[in-house]
Amino acid sequence: MIIPWQELDADTLNNLLEHFVLQEGTEYGEHDVSLADKVADVRTQLQQGLAVIVYSELHESVNIVPKATLDRAQVDDIPE
């Protein structure tokens, strides 16, 4: 289930973004990037519709995924 980021409380969204960034350990190359900048990058991706927040009832977990990945997964689930 997709959770619209706009419907989350600002503190909840920020905590989710920080948790995601810390969990992912995204590599930014040779340059050190601050936690605030990483959070801002993911927030921008949400605002631009490039990423979405997904809740899994099965795993009772929340994740942030690229929208393109989600679109491909939905197409793959369509029976032929």
UniProtKB/Swiss-Prot annotation:
Instruction: Quote the InterPro entries the UniProt record gives.
Output: UPF0270, YehU-like_sf
- A single Pfam family it belongs to is UPF0270
What SUPFAM superfamilies is this protein classified in? Answer: YehU-like (SSF118001)
> What family classification does the UniProt entry report for this protein?
Belongs to the UPF0270 family.
Q: Cross-referenced NCBIfam families, in alphabetical order?
A: PRK04966.1
User: What protein name does the entry list?
Assistant: UPF0270 protein AHA_0994
**Which organism is this protein's natural source?**
Aeromonas hydrophila subsp. hydrophila (strain ATCC 7966 / DSM 30187 / BCRC 13018 / CCUG 14551 / JCM 1027 / KCTC 2358 / NCIMB 9240 / NCTC 8049)
Supply the source organism's classification. Answer: Bacteria, Pseudomonadati, Pseudomonadota, Gammaproteobacteria, Aeromonadales
